[in-house]
């Protein structure tokens, strides 16, 4: 996780303080999709080193559509509680076992559920980074493969979310703020790549886990404070 997936984590809580969650999610949907497409394209040469992307992507799209409709129908609190619990377990596991990784066989079995949960969170609350970031991190992929995996999955879930928002009419009257957010979002891509290249593999691991922990804390504060 880095600049590309911190956009909704930072923007949605801030926007939610002055408006409703539906407006916050709609405002961030287009900029978030563009930044992830840009990052995935720039790291596409690492796609052969990834794992489970097809299954995670397909189930993520399905979950994103369902989650977007849940956004206007259900309380977000149960989803946030579940997300916090999963991420807390992972952060504690990493702290106790820094070399923890999941085997290819185990990841294949769990990938459909993880992809579906990621899409549901992306559609329902606009934030799925802590979950999919934790999951991809425990694959321990090479750095650019890690980036390509996460940004591709975010782009797929974000595209499904955007289509569902359009069909549901959630972007009506919100186009201006959504489009205005695109330029500053895309401007962060080179900065994010520069920051990423300054880290060693060990520092990158620690940075990812620290970002996940901070992100889920901010989400909890935004939801329950």
Kindly label every feature range from the protein language model.
Residues 37-45, 68, 82-107, 193-194, ...:
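Transmembrane helix exit motif
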Residues 5-54, 115, 119-122, 129-190:
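Small-residue-rich hydrophobic segments that form or flank transmembrane alpha-helices
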Residues 49-59, 82-84, 105-115, 145-152, ...:
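Cytoplasmic-side transmembrane-helix entry/capping segments in multi-pass membrane proteins
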Residues 48-95:
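Glycine/small-residue-rich loop that forms an oxyanion/phosphate-binding "nest" at active or ligand-binding sites
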Residues 1-3:
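Conserved small/polar residues in nucleotide/adenosyl-binding loops
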Residues 66-71, 121-127, 161-164, 215-225:
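Hydrophobic alpha-helical transmembrane segments in multi-pass integral membrane proteins
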Residues 190-213:
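Interfacial loop-to-transmembrane junctions
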